[in-house]
Curated annotation (Swiss-Prot):
This is Probable inorganic phosphate transporter 1-4. Belongs to the major facilitator superfamily. Phosphate:H(+) symporter (TC 2.A.1.9) family. It comes from the Eukaryota. Although related to the sugar transporter family, it does not transport sugars. One of its GO terms (biological process) is phosphate ion transport. The gene is PHT1-4. Induction: In roots by phosphate starvation. Expressed at low levels in roots. Its main location: membrane. The lineage of its organism: Eukaryota, Viridiplantae, Streptophyta, Embryophyta, Tracheophyta.
């Protein structure tokens, strides 16, 4: 049985070794790039509006029209959703390693192409930018199921949660780096090409050279991805895929002996036995009986979490303006506005985002996934209500810092909570031959939530007073009521967490049921399953 395969037992009981940390860095740099690319757009959207939608007759600086802003902010999420489903499925069909390099090269190419977006009109530039950001998102989407699955299948069961969490925690550094790069670029351009505030000189407040600033910020994301490509190609296929899906226990033992200091004996007959028993398909009656409620729990929790998380993260600049933590747009030049938005996001990343990720790394294998996720949803709800109920108090002079502190705590408990655990758990609780697919489905549900948040929040957060809305937007429900809605999403996630099993300290095969006999599964020749081609020797 799978639980008795020596190659898998050796992986579960292996001491933490140098290659584990190497794998964390290789997989983590993908997530560093993912976070940088997905969140860097929020740093430059105000600048894009000033450059391409400038109206000299307007008292306010140019801003992206509602449909354009929604597309620029949300199109990468649409690509990510599609990529999660496609590459998740492909990772179970072709193997984790074969697909892993494809996603990274797609990210590198589209990162560079995003910064080279062109057109004879504003619409042309935005259309080109959206095209490349969709395919950038497609590559990013593949990184979610593949990185999580690869790390879970390499790790030992004692520290598996920390290893997967460490990969995901690189997102925090991606966010931070995005802010730092934007600060450096905007400061450098501002010092070289200084400009007056918009209200003092509407045309001169946006210097022509500012068109290079946003391009540099977007293109920088290609560098860490490119540096990681070689090492991804050197990684061997995971032993769990090779033994349980490709049915080659000998190759699995050989691969793991090369990279981990463990003695492994091949057991082809036991691997064949697992293949004969574990043949039920995705969404079959047996799958739904074993894992249906688990998949429902992971998808719903990730969906509602990302509505709250991404709507808040993408639109930090709007929230900061609403509480007057950022000056009014017409009192700043274009590059000064970019600098101050980037500085604010960097501060939140440094104080709220990164600590939350690493608290998860340190505590997840001590207190478990369930407690962290449940507690995270609870405290996110509490802090969002703490922002929403006395919202008018936070907008009065002298109370803005308190708002930012409370806002940072919501990010802390998102990352020391469901933002991390919703990524980790789907990589642990499903069978090896469906693991990448199920993680992709769960992650795609999350990105559907991100799309709802990124598109919906643009409209919902608009003032209820039509005279105070951004140009082109109808009146919304306001930031205060939007925060109430996001708190409600967290409440839903709290209750659906009870559908997700605790995976701390258990082997992947114990969690997925692959080490259990099941009378409902008919005996069949090992060659009857043609759904996955055996992986060739590395």
């Amino acid at each position: 049985m799978a639980g008795e395969l020596k190659v898998l037992n050796a992986l579960d009981s292996a001491k933490t070794q140098w290659y584990h940390f190497t794998a964390i860095v290789i997989a983590g740099m993908g997530f560093f790039t993912d976070a940088y690319d997905l969140f860097s757009i929020s740093l430059v959207t105000k600048l894009l509006g000033r450059i391409y939608y400038f109206n000299p007759a307007s008292k306010s600086p140019g801003s992206l029209p509602p449909n354009v802003s929604a597309a620029v902010n949300g199109v990468a999420f649409c690509g990510t959703l599609a990529g999660q489903l496609f590459f998740g499925w492909l990772g179970d069909k072709m193997g984790r390693k074969k697909v892993y390099g494809m996603t990274l090269m797609l990210m590198v190419i589209c990162c560079l192409a995003s910064g080279l977006s062109f057109g004879s009109s504003a619409k042309g530039v935005m259309a080109t930018l959206c095209f490349f950001r969709f395919w950038l998102g497609f590559g990013i989407g593949g990184d979610y199921p593949l990185s999580a699955t690869i790390m879970s299948e390499y790790a030992n069961k004692r520290t598996r949660g920390a290893f997967i969490a460490a990969v995901f925690a690189m997102q925090g550094f991606g966010n931070l780096t995005g802010g730092i790069v934007a600060i450096i670029v905007s400061a450098a351009f501002k010092s070289r090409f200084d400009a007056p505030a918009y209200r003092d000189d509407r045309t001169g407040s946006t210097v022509p050279q500012a068109d290079y600033a946003w391009r540099i910020v977007l293109m920088f994301g290609a560098i860490p991805a490119l540096l990681t490509y070689y090492w991804r190609m050197k990684m061997p296929e995971t032993a769990r895929y090779t033994a349980l899906v490709a049915k080659n226990a000998k190759q699995a033992a050989a691969d793991m002996t090369q990279v981990l200091n463990v003695e492994i004996v091949e057991e082809q007959e036991k691997a064949d036995e697992v293949a004969r028993r574990e043949q039920f398909g995705l969404f079959s009656r047996q799958f739904l009986r074993r894992h249906g409620r688990h998949l429902l729990g992971t998808t719903v929790c990730w969906f509602v979490l990302d509505i709250a998380f991404y709507s808040s993260n993408l639109f930090q600049k709007d929230i900061y303006t609403a509480v007057q933590w950022l000056p009014k747009a017409d009192t700043m030049s274009a590059l000064e506005e970019m600098f101050k938005i980037s500085r604010a996001q960097t501060l939140v990343a440094l104080c709220g985002t990164i600590p939350g990720y690493w608290f998860t790394v340190f505590f997840i294998d001590i207190i478990g996934r369930f407690v962290i996720q449940l507690g995270g949803f609870f405290f996110m709800t509490a802090f969002m209500l703490g922002l929403a109920v006395p919202y008018h108090h936070w907008t009065t002079p002298g109370n803005h810092i308190g708002f930012v502190v409370m806002y940072a705590f919501t990010f802390f408990f998102a990352n020391f909570g469901p933002n991390s655990t919703t990524f980790i758990v789907p990589a642990e609780i499903f069978p090896a031959r469906l693991r990448s697919t199920c993680h992709g489905i769960s992650a795609a549900a999350g990105k559907a939530g991100a799309i709802v948040g990124s598109f919906g929040f643009l409209y919902a957060a608009q003032s209820t007073d039509a005279s105070k809305t951004d140009a082109g937007y109808p009146p919304g429900i306001g930031v205060r009521n939007s925060l109430f809605f996001l708190a409600g999403c967290n409440v839903i996630g709290f209750f659906f967490t009870f559908l997700v099993p605790e995976s701390k300290g258990k082997s992947l095969e114990e969690l997925s049921g692959e080490n259990e006999d099941d009378d409902d599964v008919p005996e069949a020749p090992a060659t009857a399953d043609h759904r996955t081609a055996p992986a060739p020797p590395a």
